[in-house]
Regions:
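Short, positively charged and aromatic/hydrophobic N-terminal segments
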Residues: 3-4
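Mid-to-C-terminal polyanion-binding domains and interfaces
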Residues: 68-72, 313-317, 323-358, 411, ...
Length: 588
């Protein structure tokens, strides 16, 4: 049990300056110091910097069984998770089987609202009726002991490919390919689920060559599938270092040339310049639409977008995902609006609480993480939102079954929590663990389930747990202090040598002191975004922040009064034009 929960206040300081050259300083700040380290980071090599796939546990077993199934024409089931890692992973193995001329398989993606995460007995029985002999999981399975035993009893061999932590030992599967296995000797422990599938494909290709029976496609053609690997790696927010950096780097290269109809149509619809697509385009534009499929309907819709071979079909799924993503935005906005009203009423009647706990049985659990994040950012405290799953989402024919909610399930509330950046949520929930059925997540985000009769005591339990907070005011280290005159095409080009950015390789953070916000503007359909022109007297640059109000920064941001800005530097490509600008992080 964690006895202390750390509350962090934002305090900025600049990392020690070692080099005048910006790129050298940024590399040094990331612990990249030797010439060999610099070369490896700045020049990812697809051959030299990827590990042997057979270093993954059980890879030989998995490859042997899959090759046997392909040779004998056995029917294979591919069971993947419903998120923006699992769906591309399912599409990846789908496309690989098509590439080698194997068609006797089916993709199964569970309904998020009805079946939930991982394997389930109803779905396995559906696959057994479809005469599946080999079941391959993607981005799930490592904890599904009972379900895998059930699949075996129904005559299936099971190969698990996953990247999550094991629990209570390993399931009795034929093969478990997972870099996080306790006995794994694989050099990289954190790769996404689709990344594990890519390693499986590489192993299958190498094994076929070694056996003198190479697959019937031109050497290197499989690399066109890296667009899905890059998409999933960036979507799943794994650390973009080591092998992940290589996969993301080359994944983006392939995405910029992608022949995938669905993605090309999606880029066009969103006015994304495919030649300049970045990790931000993936994270803010593409990933939400893939995730919208499971949150608002069925994940199969996103899968069909990624695997579409007909232009009309691809166009239809682009429009559908865009529509349900817009519906998702409206629903999240509605939840946020209702939650704010409840918060205001509670403050008026009970006073302010250090933890916000709110819910409504009509709120859809799949949307609550997005809503909780918005509220936590505005109110600067941990937020726990709960709702109840509704068992009404139809299944797509051939990809799943259906089930009715049991009385026990109807009595369970599910929710999401988000931190304001100050409180470790897992530690907080650990102290109040007797109130949950289950919980999990990370320091800043998590999920939980709770019995209906216990929801009314959850707020008090979390508030009591939050009394074990120590304020140590840690510093946020900034890469460098710059002036507006330092921003140029050349400096941006230097910074972008470090891309792609993400977890483990965050965008460089800079401080700009004593700059003047000349004009503060709002933009967007509902004026939900912020745009500011900054001047130092000689130079002017635009800075933006999405879904932000100037009021959030208090007295630190006033038009016509000099301020200190913490920001990233970026180059934006949109609708055929480019712009160097700042992305606002904070003011002080």
């Amino acid at each position: 049990m964690c006895d202390i929960i750390i509350l962090m206040s934002k305090k900025y300081s600049v990392k020690p300056k070692v080099f005048d050259n910006l790129i050298e300083q940024l590399l040094y700040n990331r612990g990249i110091k030797t010439e060999a380290e610099k070369d490896k980071f700045l020049n990812p090599d697809f051959v030299k910097h990827l590990h042997d796939p057979f270093l993954l546990p059980d890879m030989k077993k998995a490859v042997k069984r899959i090759l046997k199934a392909v040779k004998n024409g056995e029917r294979i089931g591919i069971w993947s998770d419903y998120d923006a890692d699992g769906i591309p992973g399912g599409a990846l193995l789908h496309d690989f089987f098509k590439l080698i001329g194997f068609d006797n398989f089916i993709n199964y993606i569970p309904d998020r609202h009805i079946e939930g995460y991982g394997l389930n007995s109803d779905g396995i029985e559906e696959l057994a009726k479809d005469k599946i002999k080999l079941l391959i999981t993607i981005d799930c399975g490592i904890r599904d002991h009972k379900e895998i035993e059930h699949a075996k009893k129904l005559g299936m061999d099971v190969i698990i490919t996953d990247h999550h932590e094991q629990s209570n030992g390993l399931p009795e599967a034929l093969a478990i390919v997972n870099p996080k296995r306790a006995d794994s000797k694989y050099p990289e422990k954190i790769i996404c689920g689709t990344g594990v599938v890519w390693k499986l494909i590489e192993a299958l290709r190498l094994a076929s060559l070694a056996q003198g029976k190479p697959f019937d496609f031109a050497q290197g053609k499989e690399k066109w599938l890296l667009d899905l690997v890059g998409l999933a790696t960036l979507s799943d927010m794994v650390p973009l270092v080591g092998e992940n950096r290589v996969l993301a780097f080359y994944g983006l290269k392939v995405l910029r040339k992608s022949r995938r109809l669905g993605l090309s149509k999606l880029f066009s619809n969103l006015k994304i310049n495919k030649n300049n697509i970045t990790e931000d385009d993936i994270g803010f534009m593409i990933t939400p639409r893939i995730n919208a499929a499971s949150r608002m309907g069925h994940p199969l819709d996103a899968f069909k977008l990624l695997t579409a071979s007909d232009e009309a079909e691809a166009e239809a799924y682009v429009k559908h995902l865009d529509n349900i993503n817009n519906e998702r935005k409206v629903m999240v906005a509605g939840i946020v609006k209702e939650a704010k009203k409840k918060i205001k009423e509670k403050i008026e009647s009970e006073g302010e609480k250090v933890v916000i706990v709110l819910g409504n049985p009509n709120w859809r659990p799949a949307l609550l993480g997005l809503a909780a994040g918005s509220i936590a950012e505005e109110y600067n405290r941990p937020v726990f939102l709960w709702g109840r799953s509704h068992f009404a989402t139809p299944f797509a024919q051939g990809y799943g079954g259906s089930k009715k909610a049991s009385r026990d399930e109807e009595n369970v509330l599910k929710g999401s929590c988000r931190s304001d950046g100050a409180v470790d949520l897992v530690a907080l929930m650990e102290r109040a663990k007797d109130n949950f059925i289950e919980f999990g997540g990370h320091k800043l985000s998590g999920g939980f389930s709770v019995l209906f009769e216990k929801i009314h005591t959850l707020e008090d339990a979390l508030i009591e747990a939050s009394t074990h907070i120590v304020n140590n005011e840690p510093e946020i280290l900034v890469d460098a202090e710059l002036k507006l005159e330092n921003i140029s095409e050349n400096s941006v080009a230097e910074i972008l040598k470090l891309a792609p950015f993400g977890a483990g390789n965050e965008k460089p953070l800079f401080i700009f002191r004593d700059i003047l916000p000349e004009k503060i503007n709002r933009f967007g359909k509902t004026k939900e975004h912020l745009s500011i022109n900054f001047s130092d007297g000689l130079h002017i640059i635009r800075a933006i922040s999405f879904f932000t109000s100037p009021d959030q920064f208090g007295d630190a941001l006033k038009e016509g009064i000099k301020t200190n800005l913490v920001a990233n530097i970026e180059k934006s490509f949109y609708n055929g034009s480019s712009e160097i600008r700042l992305r606002i992080v904070d003011f002080f």
